[in-house]
From Swiss-Prot:
It comes from Arabidopsis thaliana (Mouse-ear cress). Belongs to the GDT1 family. Pfam families: GDT1 (PF01169). It is found in: Membrane. PANTHER family: TRANSMEMBRANE PROTEIN 165 (PTHR12608:SF1), TRANSMEMBRANE PROTEIN HTP-1 RELATED (PTHR12608). One of its GO terms (cellular component) is membrane. The chain crosses the membrane at residues 12-32, 39-59, 71-91, 133-153, 173-193, 205-225. It is a multi-pass membrane protein. InterPro entries: GDT1-like. The keyword Transmembrane applies. This is GDT1-like protein 5. Its main location: membrane.
Length: 228
């Protein structure tokens, strides 16, 4: 297992390049244009931090369920696999912001449904208030919306699986801290910069950079001896 600093550095670089042009990054940017920034930032960051901790915990537990040798080999395979996947995405990417447009369309559709529902009668509104989810009594609906979009957007994502693999091979605490710092930087930039910043990001460059980083991690993992 690597040092805390090594886990922190790898996680910081990997998470930053994975998230800077990711779907959740664009979602945070667009949500921040429509709702109070502090609620959007709090909801998005909370979801990403929870996901990072869950992923690192799974990675930490993996060597206790199967041998460290196998977790090391699986992690190496994941790094190479994600590296080739990202490079492929980068080479076929036209350089535009197709994902930004896709996320915006999804959020517009969701907003339209919300507006249609708000036109119901007062009786239906009262019934909805009575059936309001338990969490809305403690958290703002905007916070919960930002949280759910980011949490489920990250679930099963390439960055989540990579975090699990990294935590299985490196210091889990370092991986968590590096991931949280990177998530904070990316999400804050998205919320403050909004759509204007998101539209300036080259998905192609981000994908190629992330792919090369994964390949480097894969080579390093391949050359690193497995602890007994």
């Amino acid at each position: 297992m690597g040092s805390l600093l090594q886990g922190f550095t790898k996680s910081l670089a990997m998470t930053f390049l994975s998230e800077i042009g990711d779907k959740t990054f664009f979602a945070a940017a667009i949500l921040a244009m429509r709702y109070p920034r502090r609620l959007v930032l709090a909801g998005c960051l909370s979801a990403l931090i929870v996901m990072t901790i869950l992923s690192a915990t799974l990675g930490w537990a993996a060597p206790n369920l199967i041998s460290r040798k196998w977790t090391h080999h699986i992690t190496t395979f994941l790094f190479f696999g994600f590296g080739l996947w990202s490079l492929w995405d980068g080479f076929k990417e036209g350089g535009g912001s197709e994902e930004l447009a896709e996320v915006e369309a999804e959020l517009d559709s969701d907003l339209k449904k919300t507006n249609d529902q708000s036109k119901n009668s007062k009786i239906e509104d009262e019934q909805k208030k009575q059936k309001r989810p338990f969490l809305t009594a403690f958290f703002s609906p905007i916070f919960l919306k930002a949280f759910s979009i980011n949490f489920f957007g990250e679930w099963g994502d390439k960055s989540q699986l990579a975090t699990i693999g990294l935590a299985a091979d490196e210091n889990p605490l370092g991986v968590v801290l590096g991931g949280i710092v990177a998530q904070t930087l990316c999400t804050t930039a998205a919320v403050l910069g909004g759509k204007s910043l998101a539209s300036q990001i080259s998905e192609r460059i981000v994908a190629l950079s992330g792919g090369m980083l994964f390949i480097i991690f894969g080579i390093q993992s391949l050359l690193t001896p497995v602890d007994a």
